[in-house]
């Protein structure tokens, strides 16, 4: 994004920081004049592998604001340290494994959700799949366009549209 924006900022002083925020300033700006900030972001909510269970399932932490009830049955992509992407699916405890109190409450917490990558042991997760504690995971999403209705379907359009408007 920074390289793309830089193409449109000829004559401006560009600077980016450790968080990849981009600052574009007019050369010789007057400190007496008002400052205008255009703000948008391209980051997304995601997860991090917190632990690997003996049975090969992954416990995750949330990074950002995520609505828990939207998570079960969604696929995620886990990026290993080698850069390989591993697909997994978020699962909640199956109803036939729940006790009466769990069935009655129907509540979810991040601690009750796991990611299943198809492994049957911790060893398989680490040695075959290459997944480690601390590896990031993001929701696997798609984009589609309905030409007949002129509609786009996807997620995080507010973020993406904001960046496009600034550019």
Listing of model-derived features with the role each one plays in the protein:
Residues 1-167:
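N-terminal hydrophobic/helix-forming segments and targeting peptides
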